[in-house]
Amino acid sequence: MQKAIRLNDGHVVTLGLLAQKDGTRKGYLSKRSADNPKWQTKWFALLQNLLFYFESDSSPRPSGLYLLEGSICKRAPSPKRGTSSKESGEKQQHYFTVNFSNDSQKTLELRTEDAKDCDEWVAAIARASYKILATEHEALMQKYLHLLQVVETEKTVAKQLRQQLEDGEVEIERLKTEVTITNLIKDNDRIQSSNKAGSADDEDSDIKKIKKVQSFLRGWLCRRKWKNIIQDYIRSPHADSMRKRNQVVFSMLEAEAEYVQQLHILVNNFLRPLRMAASSKKPPITHDDVSSIFLNSETIMFLHQIFYQGLKARISSWPTLVLADLFDILLPMLNIYQEFVRNHQYSLQILAHCKQNRDFDKLLKQYEAKPDCEERTLETFLTYPMFQIPRYILTLHELLAHTPHEHVERNSLDYAKSKLEELSRIMHDEVSETENIRKNLAIERMITEGCEILLDTSQTFVRQGSLMQMSLSEKSKSSRGRLGSLSTKKEGERQCFLFSKHLIICTRGSGGKLHLTKNGVISLIDCTLLDEPENLDDEAKGAGPEIEHLEFKIGVEPKDSLPFTVILVASTRQEKAAWTSDIIQCVDNIRCNGLMMNAFEENSKVTVPQMIKSDASLYCDDVDIRFSKTMNSCKVLQIRYASVERLLERLTDLRFLSIDFLNTFLHSYRVFTNAMVVLDKLINIYRKPMSAIPARSLELLFSSSHNAKLLYGDAPKSPRASRKFSSPPPLAIGTSSPSRRRKLSLNIPIITGGKALELASLGCSSDSYANIHSPISPFGKTTLDTGKLCMASSLPKTPEEIDVPATIPEKPGELSASRKHSSDVLKEESEDDQNHSDEDNTEVSPVKSPPTPKSFLNRTITEFPFFNYNNGILMTTCRDLVDNNRSTLSATSAFAIATAGANEGPSNKEVFRRMSLANTGFSSDQRNIDKEFVIRRAATNRVLNVLRHWVTKHTQDFDTDDTLKYRVICFLEEVMHDPDLLTQERKAAANIIRTLTLEETTEQHSMLEEVILMTEGVKTEPFENHPALEIAEQLTLLDHLVFKSIPYEEFFGQGWMKAEKYERTPYIMKTTKHFNHVSNFIASEIIRNEDISARASAIEKWVAVADICRCLHNYNAVLEITSSINRSAIFRLKKTWLKVSKQTKSLLDKLQKLVSSDGRFKNLRESLRNCDPPCVPYLGMYLTDLVFIEEGTPNYTEDGLVNFSKMRMISHIIREIRQFQQTTYKIDPQPKVIQYLLDESFMLDEESLYESSLLIEPKLPT
């Protein structure tokens, strides 16, 4: 039997009492159970899920207990009423039941008399489940946790809002301050009127202002957030790279548009009209010449029109720019450019030839006068395509610099750059080779009367400059006093152009055009330089201070007119030395070439031209040298690439010396070697003269029994004979005609250009053979030494001669002793070696001149009057030598006579012996010794010639290097102690030493440091106290002194663009700093004026200063002033510009057009060509040209050869720069004005200038 569940009675009683006291529901109810069907009234108390019932509400113990957990309480219907009276007398009852989940437990039935009370009990019992309470508790806990999270979030948001409010309050305060300030400035009148209105109106306006500020703040916050986003991207490296890349593309579009326009002018203004002219009845030009001049020009124009349209299409899709496919289109067409490049030199030659036709020249001038050409010549337009490919290369360099490595166009752009660089190297060589032709044609166009001799494409331009020409009467006046007034100087000023064959003397017209003077075209073969350096000290005592040591005379003896003398005066010693050196070298080259082409020894069939032609190293490319197809002034192919050793060999080759090669070498040797190497080479040539001539040429020179033609074969044909329109010509040398070759006799290397001191001073007599029997000139006498000399035969070199090092001897006299020792050795051995054959004489050491035979001892110099002597200078009738076809006088004999006339060492017997060598039948050994003598003299003259050019034109090399200066002086002193030295050679060496040791006075040329020192202690005066003329003059003086101080070696290697630019190019950086200082100074001077009228007056005055600078040819100052006025800080001052006069604005536009960078500064270049020095050009123009050359081609080829074509182009630019540097202004420094121009006390930087401009004229609200 199941036991009953035991309960703790005490605990139940306690709960019952608690239910009686704190129960949820209490009251009397009637209950009925299954055990007792009668209704019993009990007092019930509900405590949680326990239902207690008591007998009465005062019973101490409960009668029973029901556990309500899991039960169901609900209303029950009333039972059917009985018919008994007892039931009918009862009141209506309300029933409800409690059903338990356990089926064994019976339902509890309860009733109450009140329906409301019944519903409340049902509801209370229904809620008395612990499970329901636990569920509600869980739900409440979830709500509680959620509310806690919400509270925390709200706290964070509240904190952020409070921070934003604080920031907003600060910003509001700042904006209120700004708004207040703005309103005070702009709305002062309106604020005052609003203050007079009523309080109601004030309240409305304040509300409107608040709303406006609120709206402004909301918009400002949005804009600020968006601005931050934009600024973050703008400052990113990617955005910066893309921005620079876009700028490169936009610049490329502008340059391409300009280039297409240039090609359009070339085709429409020249090509097509000339085609029509060639089809006329009397054509001024043939169709073949038109095709040769304009080969592929029209095709190139069409190609670039397509390229330009494609580039515009790419720009229209900005910011997405895809360019690689454009260059892919261009690359297959490069063969068209290559044909144009190869034809470029030929086209200019054909053009120069056609311009000799007056009808064509007149027609061409009409075409060039069209407005579209803008005063540019046809040669200029033909050169534009040569610069386009290098411009593409620079653009591709910049694009690749700003293109990421992972960019899709990177590989394509790299490939395009490599292909264009290959063509660019060819183009640079062509431009270098044709520059001389274009220069000659440009000068010819500047001469109003024309100058046909400049249309000779074989002429080489050497130098130009402004010299003063004096007549003989003015010369005599100048020796008694000053030269004269400024007007007299201006009238005597001449613009001189030196070419390899002619000297052109012109005057400058008002429009910049040149006019030939009387006898202004001088053939150099008729000239003799009459400068006498040895008499300078005596002349200086009587000459005026203005022309002291600065004048030089040129004696001219034309063949078809009377002789005359030209007296020219340079502005400085250095300029005079440069002019005389170049004139001497040009005269020497042209005379010696003339002598070379004529007969001197009929007994020999070997000639110097044949000797040059037989030397394949002069025209055939080799591993260490490559040639162009252009010839230099000595009719030898120009060097394109060469090793350093081959360049030094060309410098010391005794057979010729081209003036253009010498100038280029001396300008650029620092790039590939140093001064000590050059000096060692010259010393070695002096000590070993035979090493200056190639062995094969020596063999030919000393060979008299072999036919050179049979030995070496025919020379190649002329390059022009096989020239085609679009193919490069073969490398070849022109030949002489058979009849001329038959007349040629044995010549010597000195006659081909190496003799620069004696033969350079030869004069050409206007008479012919009548001069042969003329007496000696009475102007000077020559004393001839009658000392005896021993005849010696040629022997191989002794070991002492072979191993002589090319260094300066430590002891005085060692050099001359070494040379004398070789002669003594030969003299002693000659008696035992009389039977040596000619084959043993291929290399001979320098020996002394052989003695004169006794049969000539009693003859006098008057029997040989073929040469004249004038003041100690030999005056030979070289034209008679050139024109005489039957002359039997050898070049060796002629040279011997010439040198003997100027030398006090050899006797007259030696002179007569040398003249008769050609006809007296002496042995070959004696003839070879005669040639050795000439070669030795040629070597000495070559060394002195190069040193003279080096010292006179490049003095800074010796001023900055004391060791080099000391070595040269020691070497020259040793040369002067040589007993075999001729008088003219000794004088030349003495002049070089005097030039090295002479300290130039700087009284007439104020240096920049001295000018700055003059301003110390000077009080700065305001701008209004200085006239515009004084400012312009002093600014020009400062600009010229800064520009003049730049040494030309700084122009090599782009040092101004390197990281160490201040160390490598300090003077170029100083010039740049000065330019920026003046530009900032002018802008600051304009901005500092608070009054509008004062600012307008300052602008007008500075424009007037710029115009005066233009008249002074100071184009650098013009650009300084115009660039400062065009700054944004000044250009935006619209109210100020309204006060500026129209005339000033028109003048400013004219000046800006003059110095504009359009077309590579074409207007500025034209002005520089049409002006006479002194002049200050814009340095940036030349630096741009140099960068263009440096970027286009390297200094060395892949084989390690020096790019000499590049050096030649850079040398030509430096030559133009030095032309402007050497001519100085005659302006006296004024310390007050200079102190004002150098004052930096009130200067502002770019940012401060713009801020001051905004204060003057604030930006208008948008």
UniProtKB/Swiss-Prot annotation:
Lineage start: Eukaryota, Metazoa, Chordata, Craniata, Vertebrata
Binding partners and assembly: Homooligomer and heterooligomer with RASGRF2. Interacts with USP8, thereby regulating its stability.
One term under GO cellular component: cytosol
PH domain ranges (all copies): 22-130, 460-588
Domain N-terminal Ras-GEF: 635-749
Pfam families: PH, RasGEF, RasGEF_N, RhoGEF
Protein name, as recorded: Ras-specific guanine nucleotide-releasing factor 1
Residue ranges of domain DH in the record: 244-430
Gene: Rasgrf1
Organism expressing this protein natively: Mus musculus (Mouse)
Record text about domains: The DH (DBL-homology) domain mediates interaction with RASGRF2.
Comp. bias intervals (Basic and acidic residues): 821-839
Tissue-by-tissue expression: Brain.
Protein's job: Promotes the exchange of Ras-bound GDP by GTP.
UniProt record, GO biological process: neuron projection development; positive regulation of MAPK cascade; positive regulation of Rac protein signal transduction; positive regulation of Ras protein signal transduction; regulation of neuronal synaptic plasticity; regulation of Ras protein signal transduction; regulation of synaptic plasticity; response to endoplasmic reticulum stress
Post-translational modification: Phosphorylated by PLK2, leading to ubiquitination and degradation by the proteasome. Ubiquitinated and degraded following phosphorylation by PLK2.
Record keywords: Guanine-nucleotide releasing factor, Phosphoprotein, Repeat, Ubl conjugation
Every IQ domain range: 208-233
